[in-house]
Amino acid sequence: MYKRQEVGAEGVGLFRTEFFLLSNPSGMPDEEEQTRYYRKLAEGCSPHGVIFRTLDSGGDKLPCEQLRTPEPNPFLGWRGIRVSLSRPELFKQQLRAILRACADTPGCGIMFPMVSGYTEVVTAKHILQECREELERKNIPYARDLKVGIMIEVPSAAIMTDVLAREVDFFSIGTNDLTQYTIAVDRVNNRVANMFRPTHPAVIRIMDMTITAGERENIPTAICGEMAGDITLLPLLIGLGATSMSVGVHLVPIIRYAIRNLDYGQCRDMAQKALQAPNSRAIVDLSTALARKSYPALFE
């Protein structure tokens, strides 16, 4: 938290709440424990805020004992918002904790992961509203202006972003999973890992579709994943219209420096060319060329 302040990061763009759960192998922390933990984080990041991603258990993440279920293909199975919606009491516990923790810290938000369509979003929002009403009845202070967003990491959600943009306050593109699901490549499988390319033309077009849908409804789109911290691809992301990058603390000074040295008009023009490129190599070359021109010192 303090390191974040030292490097000039503006809040926490993605707090993975499941990491907190991993430290509790015997079960999910209760509402009070979660509230204390989230509040400390929110207060430490004030006034910029924290985006709390709800439990993203499954896939490549080890869940606590309460959620441990063997699956033949965990990346396409019970994970993300699917887990939360199937365990409404655990979900409500976490939502109430986040609402309470952010009562006195404006600028915070909540984000639902692994969304695949409209029904999941409205169902999750309905449960969140129930939590607000429960806290209201008990006269427990809670965040009344908490922003609600979703991760765009499944192609079906990306295709529906024109509809989903009317239901949320922001998007966050999870480039790692979006790439994996778009081009059907398991990034941890050595036999096909070389095919895992976030700059695949289909991935870039899906990102453009998502950002454009957000712009039409005046909602921002953040970028998460390894792609957000790649200085060679930063011109492309800025050109597509991404409004913020969620990166590791150690990358914040570098990314801030790079962004300050980019010309948005040039990035926009380059991104339009990239959207017409036939392959990943052409897209990388276009973005890298502008990156080297804009901040040569970072390539020395």
Predicted regions and their residues:
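Conserved alpha/beta-domain cores
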Residues: K3-E300
